[in-house]
Amino acid sequence: MSVDANALFQPFKLGDLTLPNRLVMAPLTRNRAAEGDVARDITATYYGQRASAGLLISEGSQISHQGQGYLRTPGIYSPAQVAHWRKVTDAVHKAGGRIFIQLWHVGRVSHTSLQPGGGAPVGPSALRAQTKTFLEEGFADVSEPRALDLSEIPGILRDYENAARNAKEAGFDGLEIHAANGYLLDQFMKDGSNHRADAYGGSIENRARLTIEATEAVLKIWDKGRVGIRLSPAKVNDTADSNPQALFSHVVEKLDGLGLGYIHMIEGATQGDRNAVDVDYEGLRGSFRGAYIANNGYSRDMAAEALSSGRTDLVAFGRLFIANPDLVERFRLNAPLNEPDRATFYGGGVKGYTDYPGLDEAA
């Protein structure tokens, strides 16, 4: 029997933004950017179709050429990229929606063919991740990284600040820092990938330093209520920590002190076991005064229960939004859901992107 889903459709105040419902479209890499890593016109259509979500969070957008890890992902560091993202934000706003951009640096999860001058990807340490990237020929092993030199870190922080400034120029309503899923900031935080012996390695405080400094960099540009961050305590992309509870308790405490608008928490393994790591997510939520977005395999009923019980403020959905642009209305009516076509998740054109039918188009 279906639970009372009324909690899904209550408005929520996020900073100075009022969200009309508690559904968040999670950031979803779709690998459809055009030459120059700019968002295409069909991307404006794609996000505009989904504007009924309480909040849209864009696909990860690299803050620099070095920050790219997959083929045809959009950037937010060039004037052309800013101009094309403006078409997306205009489409979302015209449809009555709200959209944040996700700022992304992949770190070691990349390939030399995607890096400036064919160079090695960068990470906290010269440790190759046992994971894949997406190239012209399909999925391939990531390349051997090099360790970032201490002298390079200020440049990374400037890239975050510049990307935040560009996001404002592109018309976004706010931004989310991608500090999850085994990418650069997550690599620095977790001791499985960070073997440094300087101010950015060793202790939990040191390993968390880059994440906190990147957050402070974007807060130079944006009001704190318009900034969120995504975290993933579990192992992702071969990036794990020996004591995630202690690590993320510290990280959340530091982020709370900065007054961020929200934490977007991937609870358990991404698209996998929700109990993949022994972490007290409710405890983390309780130590943060901003909003909490729960993510990972939530159904309509699970989300309604979590919201009704007060365990979360908002719930993010990924694949359900891929296949159901009108997910909010489908949840409201408890209507059948379209099934996502996994074959079209990464790369391609309109098929599996903007051609999923709405309820009024269903046969």
Per-segment meaning from a language model:
Residues M1-A363:
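Flavin-dependent oxidoreductase catalytic cores
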